Amino acid sequence: MNKFLKRLCLIILLLIIVYIIYLYTFYDYNFYSSIIETPIPMFTKIEEKDTHGGFHGDGEALVKVYFSDKQAEKFIRKIDKNIHWNKLPMKDILQTCLNNNITDEISVPIIENGYWFFLDRHSKATNKYNYYDMFGRASSNYSIAIFDIDSNVLYIYSLDT
């Protein structure tokens, strides 16, 4: 019985270690995939700039995801099936929000060819895809994603105030 308990504890410990490694390795992919409602391929290069951490976690973040040509083709097929992704150009009001909030450290280049996605993450959002609803509130929590098909780069910008 004692030998059985030792083996059981060892197995449980190994499972916990494997789970922690999994979370550490794949958390970003799953988190950003949930924001844009489209799976990001594993093992793509991800760069992050984040100014969150102020009062109540206020700040902005920009994530750049670099795709290979093959990954980009698959990703485009997936966003074509998602009705909340739209072809560029982006609505002027969203482009203004993007340009007015981005700092020198966090910037998105002007993109001519690609797709865009908006998600209102505010707790009072009635339609999380309707960007007009966010203007009547004292705070904003939203994400804008832009996929550049010329350079195969996905930009995910998030603002929390």
Regions found by a protein language model. Name each.
Residues M1-I17:
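N-terminal Sec-pathway targeting helices
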Residues I12-L15, R77-K78, V108-I110:
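Intrinsically disordered, low-complexity regions enriched in Ser/Pro/Gly/Gln/His and often acidic
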